[in-house]
Amino acid sequence: MGKKQNKKKVEEVLEEEEEEYVVEKVLDRRVVKGKVEYLLKWKGFSDEDNTWEPEENLDCPDLIAEFLQSQKTAHETDKSEGGKRKADSDSEDKGEESKPKKKKEESEKPRGFARGLEPERIIGATDSSGELMFLMKWKNSDEADLVPAKEANVKCPQVVISFYEERLTWHSYPSEDDDKKDDKN
């Protein structure tokens, strides 16, 4: 597999002396030994080169958020069409019927602040759904959820501030005093 370099990451790559692959799309999610992993489609590579990667190694919060949002939308569609699908699945064997039940139970568990967990940090942000959402990592959990920014601003303002502070960049410009010092020399 050849290596591709994201131009936005050039500075980081030079510091780490390591090239980064560019994620095209997040395809799936799983939990292995308590760690969340995502199945990734790599830009410029075929589907044969898709790989499962641990969440902590990834730097694509927008793509993860987009994937989680699409899963949420797909689940809501499944609920509205649930009756029709069951009638059509009479010919399926029992092993296959139990899989959707497990997935349904898993996705009906509380998400976001409804889980009652304490926020640890914000991994990323997206507005792909038309509303600003944060990808929130929870303390004592390997899972992350999309939560509305409005809700996070009220329930954990310090976590939100930390997220923005981590991303602040300061640009220093020469002041007039510096210019005068240069003229005297």
Swiss-Prot record:
Post-translational events: Not phosphorylated. Ubiquitinated.
Keywords for the protein's UniProt record, in alphabetical order: Isopeptide bond, Nucleus, Phosphoprotein, Repeat, Ubl conjugation
Record site feature (Histone H3A7 binding), residues: V23, L40, W42, L58, C60
Entry GO terms, CC: chromatin; chromocenter; chromosome, centromeric region; chromosome, telomeric region; female pronucleus; heterochromatin; intracellular membrane-bounded organelle; male pronucleus
UniProt domain Chromo: residue ranges: 21-79, 117-175
Single GO MF descriptor: enzyme binding
Chain segments carrying region Disordered: 63-124
Pfam families named in the record: Chromo, Chromo_shadow
Translocase among keywords: no
InterPro entries given in the database record: Chromo-like_dom_sf (IPR016197), Chromo/chromo_shadow_dom (IPR000953), Chromo_dom_subgr (IPR017984), Chromo_domain (IPR023780), Chromo_shadow_dom (IPR008251), Chromodomain_CS (IPR023779), Heterochromatin_chromo-domain (IPR051219)
Keyword check for Nucleus: yes
Subcellular location: Nucleus
Interacts with the PxVxL motif of TRIM28/TIF1B, annotated site positions: E16, A125, T126, L135, L146, R167, L168, W170
Annotated Gene3D superfamilies: 2.40.50.40
Top-level taxon in the UniProt lineage: Eukaryota
Biased composition (Basic and acidic residues): 73-89, 96-121
GO biological process entries: DNA damage response; heterochromatin formation; negative regulation of DNA-templated transcription
UniProt xrefs under CDD domains: CD_HP1beta_Cbx1, CSD_HP1beta_Cbx1
PROSITE patterns reported for this sequence: CHROMO_1, CHROMO_2
Phosphoserine, modified sites: S89, S91, S175
UniProt site positions, description: Histone H3K9me2 binding: Y21, W42, F45
Expression tissues: Expressed in all adult and embryonic tissues.
PANTHER family in the record: CHROMOBOX PROTEIN
Record's function text: Component of heterochromatin. Recognizes and binds histone H3 tails methylated at 'Lys-9', leading to epigenetic repression. Interaction with lamin B receptor (LBR) can contribute to the association of the heterochromatin with the inner nuclear membrane.
Summary of subunit composition and partner proteins: Homodimer. Interacts directly with CHAF1A, EMSY, LBR, TIF1/TIF1A and TRIM28/TIF1B PXVXL motif via the chromoshadow domain. Interacts directly with histone H3 methylated at 'Lys-9' via the chromo domain. Interacts with SUV39H1 and SETDB1, KMT5B and KMT5C. Interacts with PRDM6. Interacts with POGZ. Interacts with CHAMP1. Interacts with INCENP. Interacts with SGO1; the CBX1 homodimer binds to one molecule of SGO1. Interacts with LRIF1 (via PxVxL motif). Interacts with HDGFL2. Interacts with CHD3. Interacts with CHD4.
Protein known as: Chromobox protein homolog 1
Originating organism: Homo sapiens
Gene: CBX1
